[in-house]
């Protein structure tokens, strides 16, 4: 599966269930929501040759929040860049196609590392596992399951 094919499979309306476990206080958080990811073309960014650029908008029906994602990758590079844009901040990540059906997203800042694995089980089901660590010590983990809905 190619870079573009994997990103295309993320687009759509999803029922999103997240369970997060915070190790230091043994707290478990759970929530469910309906989200929609669509590809957009209205963000202006100049591109260089041999650089693939894909822009997405993630919207949450409940709180009307919108998050923008910009994926960029040079053709010859194994890694790509991911920018997550919200109302008050921009976060920077790098990503790679980890396996034929998995995207790995990672970020390191001040000895804290974030790793996220998005597994595309099939066209209607995906699982995401996220891990937050300080050095070699685990801080939190998260499990997300998403089912694509059509209506």
Curated annotation (Swiss-Prot):
Disulfide bonds: none
InterPro entries tied to this protein: Calycin, CpcS/CpeS
GO cellular component, one term: chloroplast
Enzyme class: lyase
EC id: 4.-.-.-
Family: Belongs to the CpcS/CpeS biliprotein lyase family.
Subcellular location: Plastid, Chloroplast
Protein name: Chromophore lyase CpcS/CpeS homolog
Keyword tags: Chloroplast, Lyase, Plastid
The organism's place on the tree of life at top rank: Eukaryota
A molecular function (GO) term: lyase activity
Role summary: Might function to covalently attach a chromophore to Cys residue(s) of phycobiliproteins.
